Amino acid sequence: MAVTLPESVLAQYERFSLYNSPYPAHDGGCAIDLYPGTLADGRTTAAPSPVAGTVRETRTVRAPPKPYAPEHDHLILIDPAASGPLAGLTVRVLHVEPSVAAGDRVERGESLGRLVRAGFFAPWVDNHLHVGVRDPDQNPYRASGSLPLELGVSVRPLEWDGTGRVVSTGDTYAVLDSPAHPDPGAAFVGVRADDGGVLDGGLPHYDGGGLLERPAPVDTAGAPAERVVSLNGDRLGVADGRTIAWDDATVTANGEPITGLSLFCARDADFGAKLICPERSFERGELVRVRVRSSDER
């Protein structure tokens, strides 16, 4: 059973991704990362609840050991309100140090606590809430096992020719001015694949990604059919339904390899291609050409 996240849930956040993660909890688009708006320093701490409901439990959980982050995170379980769109299900939220406790009633958009960065985060990942939805009889503590998620909003595919100028940088990433959001705040957008649909995921530094906003073709038996996915003529991988298995490929910026591209859906004015590049640095204003080279071309 798939669960649809309505516009009232998603509209609270500036960005989201179903597939941009290395963790099995996101396999098949069974979890979503929700990114609130950022503060002046590029980070955010507020953690707006995706739903109204009652907090069932909060607990501290282990996180992968990383030299730059704590080895613990926090899990919040919420029973959605009976009048809400996710009534009868269990909502699980990670990456929030809770200011709420079991039995507390929360409204949609009310802060659950303070967003935190644990060992689940790669250094280039912005603060966000990790959200999954389960049937009430499912184990709420296991990392994997949440229900597949569908989007109750449309995401506009933006064509991108692979070029842009650097507008911001960090220690491990650079952001380009293209593709630019044509109407910030009004709708979610994402990078368009050559044959339609919106690309979602870490290419190729995570194992796979997603192709949103395009109905999956079916074979003669009515089952989802596989199809090749490309960007600017560069083959990225093969989609089975909406899930893409990336090829053995390398992303290059001005002809030199980088870790990859971060692909997501956004409605903020700062949307643009995000290069993951801890091994390289770029200057603001620098013109960059991005390509994807398959193993056969290397």
Where are these regions (language model features)?
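Short glycine/threonine/proline-enriched tight-turn/helix- or strand-capping micro-motif at secondary-structure
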Residues: Q12-S49, K66, P148-V153, A186
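Short, well-structured beta-strand-loop connectors
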Residues: A46-E57, V100-L115, G285
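Generic structural motif
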Residues: S49-E57, G109, A216, T220, ...
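Zn2+-dependent peptidoglycan hydrolase active-site motif and core
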Residues: V55-E97
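Conserved, short, structured surface segments that act as functional micro-motifs
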Residues: P67-E71, R108-S168, D296
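Short histidine-centered loop motifs in beta-beta connectors
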Residues: G88-G109, L275-S281
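Anionic-ligand-binding alpha/beta catalytic cores of soluble enzymes and soluble regulatory domains
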Residues: G132, S144-L149, V155-G233
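Extended, charged low-complexity segments
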Residues: V238-R298
